[in-house]
């Protein structure tokens, strides 16, 4: 006869309690995530070094006292932000101040001195070919020295550098005496340099072997006597852009780092006078962008020059403009392009005039960040005196009138062995900005950098805690599901074991005849309080 089993499985009470505890934990977690952070904020405010917030964020309801403290804190915070914004705007304007100072030194480097005779060509040195080629440049008619028009002779192409070198005033003939700091000097101490005035000469132009002076005052610098050779000046037939109506020399005092730009920066010295030039060295320091507009020494140098200077920049601009318009360069311009011939002079003058009219729009020359210049004070006395005119006349075999019309004395010296420093400085730098903001922060809200770190640390902890509480329920649900699956597996295994055991016992009873064929014993319920399963069987 078939046997029917009716089985009821009941889990232990502790499993029910564990499930209840898990539900309770979930409810408490939800309550914790929904609870306001008043207590946490109050705890942070009581421990923070930020002034005032410990009176605002307190446990309990918001009262009048907390409201007044909140208003005071907001007003202080607004004032701090206003002052901090003003400081930031002032810093972004990049202001600077100029500091003037004077420093003494036991010795000073003597400046370079460039001199040029205002007359560029000696009339006695010109050949018929020179006069023919230089007609457009000098204004002289294309005639030979006898006043006749040249025949059909073919003159060779002119070499302007050779013409300047050959027909210019020679220093050996002009220099009558030379003295530097009590020691004699000569024309060999000068170097040839070409300018808009032709062949010129520079004293102490080599910066590697520059001369120094150890005393200030007259007689401790350069003193030279020159003969300007006025009788050899070119006759003026008509005025051109290159002719000059003056007599004398042009002088420029400059540093060894810059080329002479004597036609614009030089000063004139006339014959018949002794000119005293008292110099004061000035060392200027400018600020680069964004505080100033100077050119840093780290930037690319101008081709042909070792050091950047305004004079070198201007010469470079003139060279590029003449090359663009006339496809040549003048003798004094740097480069290796072809030198312009006298027939190109009109084109050159036009190009330079256009460059000058542009007022620096096409060629902007920045001021170098480090610059040396020389302030000058000039004074003059007439020479020769009546007593010295006769002596000089006999000494140089010239007439007294010639000496009055051609001789001059130039005396250049330092006023004192000191120099001025004119330096641009940042009026408001990063250190000043941080100091002002820190002072305003401490004055209005009593905070510091560490206070800001406290606030950031609190915000980090709050965000971290919120994220952990949002992710914790998911982990708890997953863990609970795994526990239920494990419990179900254990119950199934126990049930199978019990079925197998009961089947073996009933088979053994049938074989022994211990119970009736129609009635089986009915087992009572057994309640167990430990981690075991209770069951009922009915047939």
Curated annotation (Swiss-Prot):
Reaction it catalyzes: Na(+)(in) = Na(+)(out)
Q: Which GO terms describe its biological process?
A: sodium ion transmembrane transport
Q: How is its activity regulated?
A: Inhibited by the diuretic drug amiloride.
- A Gene Ontology cellular-component term: apical part of cell
Q: Which UniProt keywords apply?
A: Cell membrane, Disulfide bond, Glycoprotein, Ion channel, Ion transport, Membrane, Sodium, Sodium channel, Sodium transport, Transmembrane, Transmembrane helix, Transport
Q: Which residues lie on this side of the membrane: Extracellular?
A: 90-432
Show the GO MF annotations: ligand-gated sodium channel activity; monoatomic cation channel activity; voltage-gated sodium channel activity
Q: Which residues cross the membrane?
A: 69-89, 433-453
* Cysteine disulfide partners in this protein: 116-200, 178-185, 294-369, 313-365, 317-363, 326-347, 328-340
User: Motif GAS motif in this chain: where?
Assistant: 446-448
Where is it located?
Cell membrane
Positions of glycan attachment: 136, 165, 179, 184, 206, 241, 370
The domain of life is Eukaryota
Q: What is its main location?
A: membrane
Q: Which Pfam families match?
A: ASC (PF00858)
State the Gene3D superfamilies in the record.
Acid-sensing ion channels like domains, YojJ-like
Q: Which InterPro entries match?
A: ENaC, ENaC_CS
Q: In which tissues is it expressed?
A: Expressed in central nervous system.
Per the record, ranges on the Cytoplasmic side are 1-68, 454-539
What family does the Swiss-Prot or TrEMBL record give for this protein?
Belongs to the amiloride-sensitive sodium channel (TC 1.A.6) family. ASIC4 subfamily.
Subunit field text: Homotrimer. Heterotrimer; with other ASIC proteins producing functional channels.
What the protein does comes down to: Could form pH-gated trimeric sodium channels and function as a postsynaptic excitatory receptors in the nervous system.
Q: What is this protein called?
A: Acid-sensing ion channel 4-A
Organism field: Danio rerio
The gene that this protein is the product of is asic4a
